[in-house]
A protein has these predicted regions:
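Interdomain/boundary linker segments immediately adjacent to catalytic/signaling cores
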Residues: 1-54
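Phosphate/oxyanion-binding active-site loops and adjacent basic polyanion-contact surfaces
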Residues: 30-35, 81, 110-113
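Active-site metal-binding core of divalent-cation-utilizing nuclease and nuclease-like domains
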Residues: 56-94
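Conserved catalytic cores of phosphodiester-cleaving nucleases, focusing on short active-site segments
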Residues: 88-90, 101-108, 117
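Hydrophobic beta-strand segments of well-ordered beta-sheets in folded domains
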Residues: 102-103, 131-139, 161
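Short acidic, S/G/P-rich loop/turn micro-motifs used as interaction or catalytic elements
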Residues: 107-113, 142-145
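Short, charged, amphipathic alpha-helix that recurs within catalytic cores of restriction-modification
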Residues: 114-129
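Domain-level recognition of nuclease-like catalytic cores that cleave nucleotide substrates
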Residues: 126, 140-161
């Protein structure tokens, strides 16, 4: 982080602004790494079940094929001048049709972005075309924001469906 802060300060950023920018870059890199880990863990499942997987970074590319364009159009949410896509998308294809099965919202820090996942489900419920899509939030809960009085004996899976 210190070298990034120095780089930003060389660009005439204040120390405070440079620190914020460096931290944001670090947090973004950690988040993307977590998404990649989830994708690797799901790869075999997808192959065995004839499920395809993509992510927001791929869908934001300038040139995507027709299949990915259909996935993108099915999920793109607009906020004024901004457009938002979910982190990871699981889908199947059948001839010219694309069926979105699930979106995975991957959050390294539960605290800062926990409202995004339920928001996705609410948006998807507004249309009969997307209301079937499952929505899952995946987090390592590094900040221990999701806690239990007695630790559960089995791993938990939360679904917003």
């Amino acid at each position: 982080l210190n070298s990034k802060i120095s780089d930003y300060m060389k660009q005439n950023k204040s120390k405070e602004e440079a620190s914020i920018l460096a931290r944001q870059g670090f947090v973004s890199a950690v988040g993307r790494a977590l998404e990649k880990i989830i994708e690797l863990l799901l790869k075999d499942f997808c192959i065995k079940n004839n499920v395809k997987m993509t992510n927001d970074k791929i869908l934001r590319a300038k040139r995507i094929n027709g299949e990915l364009d259909k996935v993108k159009r099915a999920l793109l949410v607009h906020f004024g001048e901004y457009s938002v896509l979910p982190d990871i998308i699981l889908y199947q294809t059948n001839k010219d049709n694309v069926k979105i099965l699930a979106i995975l919202s991957v959050k390294n820090s539960f605290r800062e972005r926990f409202t995004e996942t339920p928001y996705w489900k609410l948006k998807l419920l507004q249309s009969p075309i997307t209301s079937h899509i499952k929505v899952f939030m995946i987090t390592p809960d590094n900040d221990d924001e999701i806690s239990f009085k007695n630790k559960p004996k089995k791993a938990l899976s939360w679904s917003m469906n």
